[in-house]
UniProtKB/Swiss-Prot annotation:
GO terms for biological process: photosynthesis, light harvesting. It comes from Macrocystis pyrifera. The LHC complex of chromophytic algae is composed of fucoxanthin, chlorophyll A and C bound non-covalently by fucoxanthin chlorophyll proteins (FCPs). The ratio of pigments in this LHC is; fucoxanthin: chlorophyll C: chlorophyll A; (0.6-1): (0.1-0.3): (1). It is found in: Plastid, Chloroplast thylakoid membrane. Induction: Levels are increased twofold when transferred from high to low blue or white light. GO terms for molecular function: chlorophyll binding. Pfam families: Chloroa_b-bind. It is a multi-pass membrane protein. The gene is FCPA. It comes from the Eukaryota. Belongs to the fucoxanthin chlorophyll protein family. Signal peptide: none annotated. This is Fucoxanthin-chlorophyll a-c binding protein A, chloroplastic.
Amino acid sequence: MKSAVMAVACAAAPGLRRPSAFNGAALTTSAKSSSAMKMSFESEIGAQAPLGFWDPLGLLADADQDGFERLRYVEVKHGRIAMLAIAGHLTQQNARLPGMLSNSANLSFADMPNGVAALSKIPPAGLAQIFAFIGFLELAVMKNVEGSFPGDFTLGGNPFGASWDAMSEETQASKRAIELNNGRAAQMGILALMVHEELNNKPYVINDLVGASYTFN
């Protein structure tokens, strides 16, 4: 083992002694390019108060504009899903549909628990329908308009298109920034609800803080 390590070290040594001018120039050019790209990302929507440009994992360190837009597309989509999840969580806590969810399983909507616990109650056929619907959305609905901003899923038409087009560019940018912030908060929020549900079956921490009692599942 020691011999193998020494052999690798000796083989690498010539490259460590004297870096060529070409390599140095390439590194300098690469550093300048990365710095320029980072500066361009700092002016993108989403680099805003209170954190500004925040990339602790370095996902954009070597990204080009296409890479950035791919990540932004994913962020917007996940944010929208998380906002729907928060709304669904709160709705399920306070209201249930009437009738039966599954006659074969003798399961009514009122019998379904809220949150993560619902996954263990949904019949296999129901889970299959959910995954099929998600696949349909992914393949046919949530497709970005070519040449538009990340998150523009209006290929099939936009019922609010007229009001959106009537807005100024500044207003449109503000709306997109608000959606990003709300989506980020919702992603953290739904994660917190799931964690606290698993910890003590009391996901609504704010209710506990203000003394508002509730029964969860």
